[in-house]
């Protein structure tokens, strides 16, 4: 049986961690792309040289997309992971960064449309819901084949902090976060449990609120500790889990940024936009969107997240209208 093929666009710390994790788990052949000369090729060779120890007999190759024709090498990819993008620099506003990364997504989306339009796409570049929308606009790919990282990473942070506080196994904690990052995230505390025991029966509300706050700023905590960069291990692993669920048709239920339309719009208060919600991920991409019932506090938090997504999606719409 032919091996799966996964392309990773962006050879920075997150992209390289995704590639290495997928290689170790022998998920499929891995093709890495980056605009910086030698970076993708170097990361690919570095990962490949670990094969004798870990025993992954895979094709692992890197390509420089300064020559855009090199994108042709992603043809036939089962999954394309998009991590390419700029980091915010001093003096750069959030809107400036958003526009620059939307421009990058436009270029990447057009390349996907040209060379590998049948692939499933996992979008990582922040903010993932808006970048997924930009990839959709640029590529014209069916939206159920596009998934943004969304709440997958926030959820694993939430689960980690709960497990640490309770001194229990990480895998016994079930909890998830929907919506956007930071202030826009919506942790579903009512659905959080340890092997079925509700979190609210195990921790006082004050402690839960502390953990929620830490989760909201989990990325910033890492940035403050690193001082020279942002998180890449946990994001890389979160992405690899999503890719494996597609490639191996595992039907994992994970909160991710998905395209909301039709009946789901009534629940989630958006239409024809991407936002973080619980989805089932399988060989076809987004195979099911789960509608949630909000209580009053959750609904208020959700509306805030929705407004942020609508605002930023409008910026993307305006960009594409001006850059046809």
From Swiss-Prot:
Alphabetical UniProt keywords:
NAD, Oxidoreductase, Tricarboxylic acid cycle
Q: Which residues bind NAD(+)?
A: 10-15, 34, 101, 124-126
Instruction: Name the GO terms of the biological process aspect.
Output: lactate metabolic process; tricarboxylic acid cycle
**What domain of life?**
Archaea
Which sites bind substrate?
Answer: 88, 94, 126, 157
Q: Which GO terms describe its molecular function?
A: L-lactate dehydrogenase activity; L-malate dehydrogenase (NAD+) activity
Q: Which SUPFAM superfamilies match?
A: LDH C-terminal domain-like, NAD(P)-binding Rossmann-fold domains
Tell me what reaction this enzyme catalyses.
(S)-malate + NAD(+) = oxaloacetate + NADH + H(+)
The record's annotation in NCBIfam families points to: MalateDH_bact, PRK06223.1
Annotated function: Catalyzes the reversible oxidation of malate to oxaloacetate.
Q: Which family does it belong to?
A: Belongs to the LDH/MDH superfamily.
Can you name this protein? Answer: Malate dehydrogenase
Taxonomically, what lineage is the organism?
Archaea, Methanobacteriati, Thermoplasmatota, Thermoplasmata, Thermoplasmatales
